[in-house]
């Protein structure tokens, strides 16, 4: 998925590198580059891809919440981008540069609650209803009673939230809807394996460079350019750590669990706390959100999603990494012409990160086809065959 959502499709990706903990060679060996193949894993700032950043204040019953958005463009419809679980708005960085060069549009990439730099009173409430309301509230806070035309584009969990937002009519100026690699049937089938996937990820990283390297070599993000900006939004410094210490060799793909001996419980707990502190010192970065704790919301994100998507009375686009992801309802709907679909092969679950140019072409073609936006830079539409 992203972490969480990536696991939904893990077994269906044909050319996936082995994940840490899955028995692949990466899980037991240190990550090393061959001679002459060293790559740059240093993080890249958001400002290389977005024009500006804004913290949008939203008033509610409990006070004020602040939602981080990244923006580009000044004309055309607003493409409101919703990331997948565990990711952040920065996962759209490379896509943003690609789409802005093809059509006249405005980009608003949003950090959903509990993710990225968004700060809310109750960051643990990740229900579909709450997050959909957040999206509507952010649009209202940014544009008032007369918002510009908006197209919702969401990846995985973000795609589900986009559909819930559209179905509840929370964005009155909505003109289009796009889901990226999220299908109810596949998602529901994968619910039982999500916790196992999350347990297989590293818990900490010694540096941002280490986190970026892991994301690429594990197959979470196959595009190094995107990983260098995207992973910054997925990890944070551990609490109580002010600066990274040491410069030890790259951490292995998995932080192996400590073996428990037969000491008394007090001794074990004391040793565990000491070990945790040492781990934080050597590996001061961890995930921004503990996805395992959001399990009670997973079913609500995806159950009934296909029919909800089909029921939205606006032009719709579905982008998939593989045609085998279609469930029965979407297969019938696609045959009936209820939405446009395009398959982008040779991508992982993070389609918009792995192939940002192809996703930008698909979205730009969709916008021009429906006369929602004007092409720029001599962009030529290429209509898909399905």
UniProtKB/Swiss-Prot annotation:
The modification Phosphoserine is found at residue 15. Keywords: Hydrolase, Methylation, Phosphoprotein, Serine esterase. Ubiquitous. Highly expressed in testis and brain. Residues 255-265 have a biased composition (Acidic residues). SUPFAM superfamilies: alpha/beta-Hydrolases (SSF53474). The modification Asymmetric dimethylarginine is found at residue 16. Residues 268-280 have a biased composition (Basic and acidic residues). Pfam families: Abhydrolase_6 (PF12697). Disulfide bonds: none annotated. Phosphorylated by SIK1 following increases in intracellular sodium, leading to dissociation from the protein phosphatase 2A (PP2A) complex and subsequent dephosphorylation of sodium/potassium-transporting ATPase ATP1A1. The modification Omega-N-methylarginine is found at residue 16. Belongs to the AB hydrolase superfamily. Demethylates proteins that have been reversibly carboxymethylated. Demethylates PPP2CB (in vitro) and PPP2CA. Binding to PPP2CA displaces the manganese ion and inactivates the enzyme. This is Protein phosphatase methylesterase 1. It comes from Mus musculus.
